[in-house]
């Protein structure tokens, strides 16, 4: 499906994305400015030899994901639950990863539930495994902590210059019969919540993607 060079680029991009993620963790502390952390993480990705696969995103508290700071964002990190999502690519081979930091000190079990679910799912992900079985594993681990998996957020495949593609990796037993195949690249993305297990779109969009060129119209 992919060339040896592309696979090598994927491994390098994943290492850089992970290093940038951990660098971001070191910056997440009370008094830090959200926008400064986002910019620093993207700069770290470039410094390490890759390009950001998408804008670094920092989501706070009830906002589960996909919050991207605008240039005028003056949000200061305080006692929130903070999710950092960043990605890197080399030659189009895209790596996507995230972490959660609990500055409030109140949600350590919630953070652990998501992390353990991700690790457990990663252990069973292999060619021939049904995506619903991965979702069930995620749901079971999160439920063991007394939380719910968010069902309308999911993991996904990664392609060349494509951040989101098939297969969908659910966070529960969705009944999807799709099987992982040799050569697929996937991102497993568990989300644990003390709430109902569903999210709503409530924030404005700050992330845009180039679709195609269009000719300039004459007056």
Predicted regions mapped to residue ranges:
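Active-site neighborhoods and metal-handling regions in enzymes and metal-associated proteins
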Residues: 1-219
């Amino acid at each position: 499906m992919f060339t040896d060079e592309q696979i090598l680029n994927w491994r390098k991009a994943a290492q850089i994305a992970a290093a940038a993620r951990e660098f971001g963790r070191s910056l997440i502390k009370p008094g830090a400015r959200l926008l400064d952390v986002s910019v620093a993480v993207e700069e770290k990705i470039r410094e390490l030899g890759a390009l950001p696969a998408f804008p670094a995103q920092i989501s706070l508290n009830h906002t589960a994901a996909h919050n991207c700071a605008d240039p005028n964002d003056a949000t200061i990190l305080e006692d929130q639950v903070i999710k950092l999502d960043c990605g890197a690519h080399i030659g189009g081979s895209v790596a996507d990863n995230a972490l959660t930091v609990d500055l409030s000190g109140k949600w350590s079990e919630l953070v652990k539930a998501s992390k353990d679910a991700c690790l457990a799912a990663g252990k069973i992900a292999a060619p021939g495994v049904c995506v619903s079985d991965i979702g069930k594993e995620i749901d079971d681990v999160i439920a063991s902590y007394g939380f719910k998996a968010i069902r309308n957020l999911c993991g996904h495949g990664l392609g060349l210059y494509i951040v989101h593609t098939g297969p969908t990796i659910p966070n529960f037993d969705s009944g999807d019969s799709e099987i992982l195949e040799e050569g697929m690249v996937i991102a497993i993305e568990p989300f644990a919540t003390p709430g109902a297990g569903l999210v709503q779109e409530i924030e404005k969009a700050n992330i845009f993607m180039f679709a195609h060129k269009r000719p300039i119209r004459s007056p």
